[in-house]
């Protein structure tokens, strides 16, 4: 039997499909495994390259297989699709993965550590609660508007106004609607408590985690931005340079070029929208406070703002902050502001 060098593993909840290929890419064997058989099967194999789609559970299986001596490559699902031939089935998917993982130019996803996944879970839960609170506030505004009651923008103002509406017996609210509004107010308070818990936990992790502490030496990086950047980028080894990290976050121009004509459009906005928004918010704060400062970064910001305006400067700085963040992670050092010569 030919030596197995590359394996395509199609992940699932209960039934996994494996395609084994030799060094020339020729199919050696294929089989179906139940969940309890996966680790036993790979433990009996010599070290080889295993490709998987970067989907649910991929980071767990990648860590387990790496611990057994294998090289694991996680590939975005959209890149695997180009290699699928024939009908859609799990064996064809696994074969496509084995071919994609053999491409030298394939863009891969870094394997997350449990610590990174913990931070990511914190951010996802907090983000969900924030979205739920925003939706609830908008719904409350719409409902009370049908009774002739309006409120200025802002969660804090609405939070103060609801008790006033409930206590006012002359505003035309029915008894039933008062009970509904009171229930919605209790739900809003519960969401506030959940968001406060997640925010406090993120800030605590930012203070205790040494990597997050280094990231917070960068202008525009607070505990929340530092923790989400670390959870997504890891140690930075998944990218060759800072520009690649910024491109993965979607902070580089989208290109539509042909021949000798180079056309650059707005930023691509690919990758994680949540991380990109935090970098832009942090950059906006830095740009707003750069006037009068004499370090090299602030001077660059002020010159660019004069030429290109505020918003373009914010996005350009967000790109630069992503590159600086990658350098801090990849070189295991803290950011040091440089004075102008």
Question: Which residues does each predicted region cover?
Answer:
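A detector of single, family-specific signature residues
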Residues: 1-341
């Amino acid at each position: 039997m030919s030596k197995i060098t590359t394996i395509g593993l199609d992940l699932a909840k209960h039934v996994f499909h494996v395609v084994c290929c030799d060094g020339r890419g020729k199919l050696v064997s294929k089989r179906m495994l139940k969940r309890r058989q996966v680790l036993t099967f790979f433990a009996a194999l010599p070290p080889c390259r295993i490709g998987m789609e970067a989907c649910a559970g991929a980071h767990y299986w990648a860590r387990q297989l790496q611990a057994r001596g294998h090289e694991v490559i996680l590939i975005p699902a959209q890149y695997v699709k180009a290699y699928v031939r024939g009908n859609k089935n799990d064996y064809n998917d696994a074969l496509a993965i084995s071919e994609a993982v053999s491409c030298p130019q394939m863009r891969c996803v870094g394997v997350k550590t449990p610590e990174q996944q913990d931070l990511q879970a914190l951010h996802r839960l907090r983000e969900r609660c924030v979205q739920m609170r925003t939706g609830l506030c908008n719904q409350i505004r719409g409902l009370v508007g049908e009774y002739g009651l309006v409120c200025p923008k802002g969660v804090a103002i609405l939070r103060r106004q609801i008790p006033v509406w409930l206590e006012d017996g002359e505003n035309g609210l029915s008894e039933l609607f008062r009970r509904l509004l009171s229930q919605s107010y209790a739900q809003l308070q519960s969401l506030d408590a959940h968001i406060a818990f997640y925010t406090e936990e993120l800030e605590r992790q930012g203070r205790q985690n040494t990597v997050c502490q280094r990231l917070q030496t960068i202008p525009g990086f607070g505990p929340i931005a530092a923790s989400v950047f670390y959870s997504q980028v890891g140690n930075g080894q998944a990218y060759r340079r800072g520009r690649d990290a910024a491109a993965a976050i979607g902070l580089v121009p989208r290109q539509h070029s042909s021949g000798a004509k180079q056309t650059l459009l707005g930023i691509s906005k690919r990758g994680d929208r949540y991380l990109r928004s935090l970098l832009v918010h942090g950059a906006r704060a830095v740009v707003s406070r750069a006037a009068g400062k004499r370090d090299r970064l602030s001077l660059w910001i002020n010159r660019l703002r004069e030429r290109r305006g505020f918003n373009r400067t914010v996005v350009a700085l967000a790109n630069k902050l992503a590159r600086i963040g990658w350098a801090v992670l990849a070189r295991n050092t803290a950011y040091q502001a440089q004075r102008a010569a």
